[in-house]
């Protein structure tokens, strides 16, 4: 995997930096693991915009990724090929099990074609293997971590991310996330050893606005260039500052305003990611 800076043959390619991985499969994805995706464009069932800055973009199928990995314990498997996934920053790996079934998993860092993959409490501590947290040594780097047993991985799934198992106390373990937050999870939750691959994803340069539109992202217009009817920062003669602390179009404070409201799980957070 390497970063490639394109030649300046056009203004859009002048600043483009691509991540090139020659090991990725160049053919079609595994058809039985594809699902149709209907484009919502940020609209709800009434057609109203509920999420701004979404719409357009290239059509693509959803790749069904196995985030649970709890029903193939003890069955040997190997990585058949590595693939690009347009739905996420990480690459995915097509895994062939000894019983003939194929599944997609998040490709760990250092994954190669032919690599052995194991699931279950007896699996060795090697990158890509999935185990319950009670069987993982303290200090191990992990990814694809479950928050609730059996629900499937929810944490550390993006390219280059990981978490660290800090301690085990009774039926809970402490995991430090990439944000710095330390969280308690049940020891029956599962996690995958190692880091997520494609760690150079954050270093790419898209190069032009059109490439962002291909990804289904629409432009973000600043509030200070709107009219007063459209945004609290709007209006004024010429270029004018907002005249107040940053807020959303609906007046909610932004840029640092905390929006977490899930008090039910506050007891599971040992150390918050915020400094104060």
From Swiss-Prot:
Residues 37-59, 225-276 are annotated as: Disordered. Residues 39-49 have a biased composition (Polar residues). GO terms for molecular function: rRNA binding; structural constituent of ribosome; transferase activity. InterPro entries: NA-bd_OB-fold, Rib_uL2_dom2, Ribosomal_uL2, Ribosomal_uL2_bac/org-type, Ribosomal_uL2_C, Ribosomal_uL2_CS, Ribosomal_uL2_dom3, Ribosomal_uL2_RNA-bd_dom. One of its GO terms (cellular component) is large ribosomal subunit. Keywords: Ribonucleoprotein, Ribosomal protein, RNA-binding, rRNA-binding. One of its GO terms (biological process) is cytoplasmic translation. One of the primary rRNA binding proteins. Required for association of the 30S and 50S subunits to form the 70S ribosome, for tRNA binding and peptide bond formation. It has been suggested to have peptidyltransferase activity; this is somewhat controversial. Makes several contacts with the 16S rRNA in the 70S ribosome. NCBIfam families: rplB_bact (TIGR01171). Part of the 50S ribosomal subunit. Forms a bridge to the 30S subunit in the 70S ribosome. This is Large ribosomal subunit protein uL2. It comes from Ralstonia pickettii (strain 12J).
């Amino acid at each position: 995997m390497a970063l490639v800076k394109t030649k300046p043959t056009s203004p859009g390619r002048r600043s483009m930096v691509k991540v090139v991985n020659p090991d990725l499969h160049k053919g079609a994805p595994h058809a039985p693991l594809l699902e149709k995706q209907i484009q919502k464009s940020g609209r709800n069932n009434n057609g109203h915009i509920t999420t701004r800055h979404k719409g357009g973009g290239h059509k693509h199928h959803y790749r069904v990724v196995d985030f649970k990995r709890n029903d193939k314990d003890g069955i040997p498997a190997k990585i058949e090929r590595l693939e690009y996934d347009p739905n996420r920053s990480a690459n995915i790996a097509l895994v062939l099990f000894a019983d003939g079934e194929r599944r997609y998993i998040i490709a760990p860092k250092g994954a190669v074609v032919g690599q052995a993959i194991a699931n279950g409490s007896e699996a060795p501590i090697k990158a890509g293997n999935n185990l319950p947290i009670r069987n993982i040594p303290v200090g191990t780097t992990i990814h694809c971590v479950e928050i609730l047993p059996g629900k499937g991985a929810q944490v550390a799934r993006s390219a280059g991310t990981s978490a660290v198992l800090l301690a085990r106390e009774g039926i809970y373990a402490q995991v430090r996330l990439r944000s710095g937050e330390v969280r308690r999870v049940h020891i029956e939750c599962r996690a995958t050893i190692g880091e997520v691959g494609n760690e150079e994803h954050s270093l790419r340069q898209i190069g032009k606005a059109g490439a962002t539109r291909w990804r289904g992202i629409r432009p973000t217009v600043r509030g200070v260039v709107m009219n007063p009817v459209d945004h609290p920062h709007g209006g004024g003669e010429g270029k004018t500052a907002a005249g107040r602390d940053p807020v959303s179009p609906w007046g909610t404070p932004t840029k640092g305003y905390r929006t977490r409201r899930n008090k039910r799980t506050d007891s599971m957070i040992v150390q918050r990611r915020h400094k104060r």
